[in-house]
């Protein structure tokens, strides 16, 4: 039986569920039994390295063990739903169906779909690329429901809300969670609209996780987002922690804040607040009014790269670095390879940062959008660089995106101020040239370390 058939096999899903029951009874004692069940049920070679790393981390009772105990302290029903939806449905069953669909249809099929429920926001943050879309666009409840229904048929069970501020649509977000209890939903949010009532709704539906945006400490955060926002975020985190609900932090690193958000003090603050993960994003000069000077220089990006990796081996929090972690997933993940983005107007973009498209979800099916010219160009071009520290066709390889956009006839999907693709990528050229030397050095060191 091949990997796809094994993962789709009901016995494999049953083995995972049995493992979770063991953990519920006595997590510390039964972890070895759980690993044994997974080993016996898994296809040969399936995530072998990761399974060994988990085993080692648990045996040493270090930061990964501490993180595991925090996960097991979550509300039991929320935890059970997360493991079922995220591990069994999205990462096992879903991945197998994605692979099958990809081979059959000759197109990328995403592990996750990013959606903008609305372009509206209750804040007016300085330099926000999402603000380029204005505040009047919305995907209807039925459109979101239909996208997810289509996505599940392709094998996609993970959905991530961006914006705008998704929590402006709190009621509809909960309705979607109810309609699709087999999916896991994550939302990037400024956190100011999370209250006691919404926490109770999260406990009820069980399949929603917020990723709260923080730009650093109070001065930096409120300087960009407005006075009092930091305190509102702290209150939201206190509520989530009190209800044993999972949440994480999202942060954009720039030349101005990179030291603060990779400091031990910042890490310790969010860990104490109850965050289970932190997702780092590199500042992208998207939009006609972007500020290229906020892009970190090579030394600053390297500092971020090194600090995140250091804390991965010492802090009980899962750290993701969107730009510097490409080696773990083979380069650029956009264009439907692992994810795509649908904005509040329905335009299907290859990336949340790259707003050029041939398709609108109101006019074509999700599958047809994945077969559209710009998505096929991504499929053909990936990876855009053999150096996994230079994954993006815009930021690190600015010669690639204009070529794809022009050859496919894709148009700008920014309704407020459409940006010419050459204008966008010209802003990235000095950065790419400066980063290449450092990236090559770091990548060579990384390859040598693996030998």
Question: What name fits each language-model region?
Answer:
Residues 1-52, 56, 222-335, 343-345, ...:
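Radical SAM enzyme [4Fe-4S]-AdoMet core and its adjacent flexible, acidic
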Residues 131-135, 217-219, 285-288:
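A short, flexible beta-alpha/helix-coil linker loop
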Residues 141-161, 167-281:
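Radical SAM/AdoMet-radical enzyme domain recognition
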Residues 2-7, 11, 15, 22, ...:
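Flexible mid-to-C-terminal extensions adjoining Fe-S/redox cofactors in radical SAM and related proteins
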Residues 89-110, 320, 326, 360-377:
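Short, charged low-complexity linear segments at domain edges
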Residues 32-197, 205:
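Conserved alpha-helical substructure of the radical SAM core
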Residues 121, 125-128, 332, 346, ...:
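Short cysteine clusters
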């Amino acid at each position: 039986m091949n990997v796809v058939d094994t993962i789709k096999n009901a016995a494999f899903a049953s083995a995972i569920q049995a493992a979770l029951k063991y953990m519920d009874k006595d997590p510390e004692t039964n972890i070895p039994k759980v690993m044994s069940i997974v080993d016996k049920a898994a296809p040969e070679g399936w995530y072998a390295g990761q399974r060994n790393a988990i085993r080692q981390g648990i045996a040493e009772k270090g930061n990964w063990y501490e993180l595991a105990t925090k996960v097991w302290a979550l509300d039991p029903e929320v935890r059970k739903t997360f493991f079922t939806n995220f591990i069994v449905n999205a990462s096992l069953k879903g991945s197998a169906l994605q692979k099958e669909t990809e081979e059959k249809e000759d197109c990328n099929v995403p592990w996750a779909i990013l959606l903008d429920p609305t372009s509206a926001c209750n804040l007016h943050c300085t330099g926000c690329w999402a603000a380029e879309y204005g505040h009047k666009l919305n995907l209807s409840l039925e459109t979101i429901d239909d996208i997810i229904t289509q996505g599940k048929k392709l094998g996609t069970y993970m959905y991530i809300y961006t914006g705008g501020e998704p929590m402006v649509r709190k009621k509809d977000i909960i309705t979607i969670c109810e309609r699709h209890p087999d999916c896991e939903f994550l939302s990037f949010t400024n956190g100011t609209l999370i209250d006691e009532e919404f926490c109770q709704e999260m406990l009820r539906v069980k399949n929603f996780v917020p990723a709260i945006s923080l730009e650093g400490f109070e001065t930096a955060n409120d300087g960009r987002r407005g006075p009092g926002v930091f305190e509102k975020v702290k209150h939201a985190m206190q509520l989530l922690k009190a209800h044993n609900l999972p949440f994480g932090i999202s942060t954009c690193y720039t030349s101005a804040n990179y030291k603060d958000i990779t400091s031990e003090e910042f890490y310790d603050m969010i860990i104490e607040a109850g965050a289970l993960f932190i997702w780092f994003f590199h500042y992208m000069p998207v939009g006609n009014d972007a500020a290229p000077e906020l892009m970190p220089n090579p030394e600053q990006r390297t500092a971020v790269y090194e600090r995140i990796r250091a804390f991965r081996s010492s802090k009980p929090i899962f750290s993701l670095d969107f730009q510097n972690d490409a080696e773990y997933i083979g380069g650029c993940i956009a264009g439907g390879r692992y994810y795509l983005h649908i904005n509040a107007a329905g335009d299907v973009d290859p990336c949340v940062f790259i707003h050029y498209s041939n398709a609108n979800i109101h006019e074509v099916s999700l599958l047809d959008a994945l077969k559209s010219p710009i998505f096929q160009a991504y499929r053909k071009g990936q990876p855009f660089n053999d150096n996994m520290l230079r994954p993006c066709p815009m930021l690190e390889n600015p010669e690639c995106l204009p070529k794809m956009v022009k050859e496919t006839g894709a148009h700008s999907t920014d309704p407020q101020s459409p940006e010419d693709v050459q204008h966008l990528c010209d802003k990235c050229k000095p950065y790419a040239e400066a980063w290449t030397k450092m990236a090559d050095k770091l990548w060579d060191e990384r390859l040598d370390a693996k030998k």
